Amino acid sequence: MKAAITATAKYLPQSVLSNHDLEQMLETNDEWIRSRTGIGERRIMNDPSKATAYMCGEVALQLLEARKMKPEEIEVIIVATMTPDMLFPATACFVQGIIGATNAWAFDINAACSGFLFALSTASRLIESGAHKKVMVIGGDKMSSVIDYTNRSTAILFGDGAAGVILEPSTNDNYGILDARLYSDGASGTSHLLMAAGGSLNPATHETVDKRMHFLHQDGKQVFKSAVTSMADVAAEIMTRNNLSAEDISFLVPHQANQRIINATAERMGLDQEKVYSNVARYGNTTAGTIPICLAELNEQEQLKTGSNLVLVSFGAGYTWGGIYIKWQ
């Protein structure tokens, strides 16, 4: 038994933060940002009363509507996020409450930008085992809550957003999620992309706030190098393991870190740009939200046909990275 995606949905805040807006806040300009990242604008959740759980809840409600499913039918809810509303309870529990999924059990996965792929793979195993038949998987982040908007190197990259899918048993074992390769490197990856404070090691104090330790920190050059290598390697591995040529692939759906990383991954796979889905110019990096937002847009645009071969690849803090092969049902 394989797991197949039977519904997609996305939520993006209405407020837009453009490169021209950032010019008023930082020593930067539109050309500089576009040439280095490919990003033109990003969405920001400006309402301080709404955060990741709200966005994921909106996605969950849309998923139920798209599948014409009652909330009581959902058996498991998995939310991938690195910006939970609170350290506990889990964001997934808030989502469960929002939609009234009284029969579900719910938990979060934090694998940063790789979170959605880690959650999707976990959910597919729950389906394949026969333990569950209706699993909701959502990736979302309110990155604006952890970004230092006085830091040019990170302020330009990130946006807010969420998206997700419903997984159910495939009607044919030749379709659905057919392969997944997931990796972590805690030996060398933990110091290059992180938020140092807010956990049990550095709980909030006046000192941690003054030192700006509650914002995302990134060693940009090292992360770029590692992301290009890791995403390209895992994409090549997925292709080799499943005897896929560049011609066989309908779409590469990469994590939307920046356009240069996306282009380098596609080049390694030998893919033409028309087979590479990218919306980083419009939304920036929404971390756990990037890949499911892409899937939702592809589905909305009716570009996904029965038998379409999709390769999903990601890279994130930890380091974490992975690839998933889906034959669309």
From Swiss-Prot:
Superkingdom of the source species: Bacteria
Coarse class of the protein's main subcellular location: cytoplasm
Family per record: Belongs to the thiolase-like superfamily. FabH family.
Protein name in UniProt: Beta-ketoacyl-[acyl-carrier-protein] synthase III
Pfam families, alphabetized: ACP_syn_III (PF08545), ACP_syn_III_C (PF08541)
One Gene Ontology molecular-function label: 3-oxoacyl-[acyl-carrier-protein] synthase activity
Subunit-level organization: Homodimer.
Any one cellular-component term (Gene Ontology): cytoplasm
Pathway(s): Lipid metabolism; fatty acid biosynthesis
The record's note on its domains: The last Arg residue of the ACP-binding site is essential for the weak association between ACP/AcpP and FabH.
One GO biological process term: secondary metabolite biosynthetic process
Gene: fabH
InterPro entries: ACP_syn_III_C, ACP_syn_III_N, FabH, Thiolase-like
Stated role: Catalyzes the condensation reaction of fatty acid synthesis by the addition to an acyl acceptor of two carbons from malonyl-ACP. Catalyzes the first condensation reaction which initiates fatty acid synthesis and may therefore play a role in governing the total rate of fatty acid production. Possesses both acetoacetyl-ACP synthase and acetyl transacylase activities. Its substrate specificity determines the biosynthesis of branched-chain and/or straight-chain of fatty acids.
Organism: Chlorobium phaeobacteroides (strain DSM 266 / SMG 266 / 2430)
